[in-house]
A protein has these predicted regions:
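Active-site beta-loop-alpha junctions enriched in small/polar residues
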Residues: 21, 63, 88-92, 119-122
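Active-site groove signature of glycoside hydrolases
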Residues: 109-125
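Acidic-and-aromatic substrate-binding clefts and catalytic sites of carbohydrate-active enzymes
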Residues: 61-69, 91-98, 125-127
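Charged helix-capping and loop-helix junction motifs
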Residues: 100-101, 130-136
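N-terminal binding-site loop/beta-alpha segment at the start of enzyme catalytic domains
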Residues: 1-82
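Single conserved hydrophobic/aromatic residue that forms the stacking wall/gate
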Residues: 135-144
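Aromatic/hydrophobic pocket-lining residues that form the small-molecule binding cavity
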Residues: 43, 98, 102
């Protein structure tokens, strides 16, 4: 697998990543108990195969339905956790809501930290300004 430096950081990121948009039973935010064995097994098999191929970066998002919770169960039940876990949350000008979204993703993914956090859906200049302020708190939340 080829790697590149991620922006101005020292993080080496693979040129291919595993997208988790279709890792969901539903686009709705459902509890894991509503996910069937077959649906979860599909995600586990894909994650296992991706790991065998050297894909060490997986991404998901709050708005990908049950994707975060299903990936979280995979991470809980296996030792094959990708080196880089990324999720996306919506922009929010309220730092408490922003932080709550970050912590919710960490909880659903059953990890101690998120390696990469993306802001999903910055569609206007108004969305960007609050993000520049609140991302500092998210950084502290993700890395402490």
């Amino acid at each position: 697998m080829q790697y590149r430096r991620f922006g101005r950081t020292n993080l080496k990121i693979p040129v291919l990543s595993l997208g988790g948009m279709r890792f969901q039973k539903s686009w709705d935010q459902l509890d894991f108990s509503e996910v069937s064995y077959e649906e979860q097994n599909k995600v586990e098999n894909i994650l296992d195969l991706a790991t065998q191929y050297g894909l060490s970066h997986v991404e998901t998002a709050k708005y990908y339905g049950t994707s975060e919770v299903q990936l979280g169960m995979c991470f809980k039940n296996t030792k094959k956790i990708p080196n880089i876990i990324q999720t996306k949350i919506p922009p929010n000008s309220d730092p408490e809501i922003f932080e709550r979204d970050v912590l919710s993703s960490i909880e659903k993914l059953k990890v101690k930290k998120i390696d990469l956090l993306a802001i999903h859906g910055i569609n206007t200049a108004e969305h960007l300004h609050p993000v520049s302020y609140t991302h500092l708190r998210a950084h502290e939340t993700c890395h402490n």
